[in-house]
């Protein structure tokens, strides 16, 4: 019988096991995200950018025939590609985090486990 409203020893042991597994899985996920290359393209595909699953910029590609476009068009396309890559990267990260924590009801601050 657990006293003072504390969980019994078996529940506590199980909670520690889950926490340790989450920690190991989180490290693995962090490594996976770091090694991902997520591509974003401008609408006309003249600019492509790649960022990691951790939203770090990796590389940029500009179609050679696009280099003669006006400055504003180039800037607009770069921004489009960056936004798309960032959106894909953050979506991927959220999905992977949900896979990691979804069934555990952790109620992490700033993270909705029911958000899909």
Swiss-Prot record:
<comment type="function">
    <text>Binds to DNA and alters its conformation. May be involved in regulation of gene expression, nucleoid organization and DNA protection.</text>
</comment>
<dbReference type="GO" id="GO:0043590">
    <property type="term" value="C:bacterial nucleoid"/>
</dbReference>
<keyword id="KW-0963">Cytoplasm</keyword>
<dbReference type="GO" id="GO:0005829">
    <property type="term" value="C:cytosol"/>
</dbReference>
<dbReference type="InterPro" id="IPR036894">
    <property type="entry name" value="YbaB-like_sf"/>
</dbReference>
<keyword id="KW-0238">DNA-binding</keyword>
<dbReference type="Pfam" id="PF02575">
    <property type="entry name" value="YbaB_DNA_bd"/>
</dbReference>
<dbReference type="InterPro" id="IPR004401">
    <property type="entry name" value="YbaB/EbfC"/>
</dbReference>
<comment type="similarity">
    <text>Belongs to the YbaB/EbfC family.</text>
</comment>
<dbReference type="GO" id="GO:0003677">
    <property type="term" value="F:DNA binding"/>
</dbReference>
<protein>
    <recommendedName>
        <fullName>Nucleoid-associated protein P9301_00191</fullName>
    </recommendedName>
</protein>
<comment type="subunit">
    <text>Homodimer.</text>
</comment>
